[in-house]
A protein has these predicted regions:
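Helical segment within the ABC ATPase nucleotide-binding domain
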Residues: 175-189
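Helix-to-loop junction immediately C-terminal to a conserved catalytic motif
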Residues: 48
Length: 247
């Protein structure tokens, strides 16, 4: 479904991604793990057009999307849940979800279909329905994360990009969100690319994983193998979180 070929992305003179290549199959959950500053968020932003690639190619369903603007990439079927949630705090839950479907309204899609999709979001996250008229800024962090995911789903994506969805949340809330991600894959066929600080939880959820260091992919493989990899264990899964990739 998604393929990155030799992607190089820059922030000014800073070479953030260095010849990154990866792929996701239809219906897969794939996770990116690595230390802070490794380039995980930059990969998501490059895919979604927020930080365009300097060179290389992004293919979605075999179509090049590298040079497209973010709104066109959303229309193609890619939605991103940003780090830090970034909900519209002065607006209600329902208004936030409506904004997630903004491009669908602009294309004059049947409003009944959009309302049906909102009902499906409420089925995934019942607390959002209970608080549909509540201002987003008055909600807990976990509820805001649910809202951010629901807002992304309102664009009706085939590929969902998630950036650190567990950040700052209680373990029970994280478990609930991860159950929803698995349900989206199982029941709706949504493909998921997950950036996650909780490497162990992410690898248990995902089919495959990539390990990044300083803008390069240094390891990849099935999640079960990465969970048993000695270096991954030492760097991300055990008590000793010290960076070990430096040689």
């Amino acid at each position: 479904m998604l393929r990155l070929k030799n992607i190089n992305t820059y922030y000014g003179k800073v070479h953030a991604l260095k010849n990154v290549s990866l792929h996701l199959g239809e219906g897969e959950i794939v996770t990116l793990i690595g230390a802070n500053g490794a380039g995980k968020t930059t990969i998501l932003n490059t895919i979604s057009g927020v930080t365009p690639a300097g060179s290389g190619e992004v293919l979605f369903r075999k179509e090049p999307v590298t040079a497209l603007t973010s709104d066109k990439i959303v229309k193609y079927g890619i939605s991103q849940v940003p780090e830090g949630r970034q909900v519209f705090k002065p607006l209600s839950v329902e208004d936030n979800l409506e904004l997630g479907a903004y491009l669908r309204y602009r294309s004059r899609e049947d409003r009944a279909v959009i309302r049906r999709d909102m009902t499906q979001v409420f089925a995934l996250f019942p607390r959002l329905e209970e608080r549909r008229r509540q201002l987003a800024g008055t909600m807990s962090g976990g509820e805001q994360q649910m809202l951010a995911i629901g807002r992304a789903l309102m664009a009706n994506p085939r590929l969902l990009l998630l950036d650190e969805p567990s950040m700052g949340l209680a373990p029970m809330v994280v478990q609930e969100i991860f159950r929803v991600l698995e349900r989206l894959r199982r029941e709706n066929g949504v493909t998921i690319l997950l950036v996650e600080q909780n490497a162990k939880a992410a690898l248990k959820l995902a089919d495959r994983g990539y390990v990044l260091e300083t803008g390069k992919i240094i390891l990849e493989g099935p999640s079960a193998e990465l969970l048993e990899n000695a270096e991954v264990k030492r760097a991300y899964l055990g008590k000793d979180k010290k960076e070990i990739w430096e040689r």
